[in-house]
Regions:
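Conserved donor-nucleotide binding/catalytic region of nucleotide-linked donor-dependent transferases
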Residues: 62-65
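Electrostatic cytochrome c docking/interface patches
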Residues: 2-19, 33-34, 38
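The canonical Cys-X-X-Cys-His
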Residues: 23-29, 85
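Residue-level hotspots at or immediately adjacent to binding/recognition sites across diverse folds
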Residues: 11, 29, 67
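C-terminal capping alpha-helices of c-type cytochrome domains
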Residues: 72-92
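Gly/Gly-Pro-rich "capping" loops immediately C-terminal to redox-active cysteine motifs
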Residues: 16, 28-59, 71-72
Length: 92
């Protein structure tokens, strides 16, 4: 159980770093920026909605303009990282 607690704390920090590294450039530090593609901002979306979209970009079932940009980003991330990222981004 102790390791589990540390894992959660690490995941939170890791998710913030993932967001900063992979998302902030287009979506802004607070997730409120509308990217050039005109899609809705991340800010204010639920973790479930964000995860569904991230998984859709990864498997090719979601996306419109700039789809290739997002596909290239999420292909680098594990399913666990996508979940952590969605959880973190939903708090913005």
């Amino acid at each position: 159980m102790l390791l589990s607690s540390f894992g959660v704390a690490f995941a939170d920090g890791d998710a913030a770093n993932l967001f900063k590294t992979h998302c902030q450039g287009c979506h802004g530090a607070d997730g409120g920026r509308v990217p050039a593609s005109g899609i809705e901002p991340i800010k204010g979306q639920s973790d479930a909605d964000l995860l569904k979209k991230l998984e859709g970009y990864k498997d090719g079932s979601f996306g419109a303009q700039r789809k290739l940009v997002m596909e290239n980003v999420v292909k680098q991330l594990s399913d666990e990282q996508l979940k952590s990222l969605a959880d973190y981004a939903s708090t913005l």
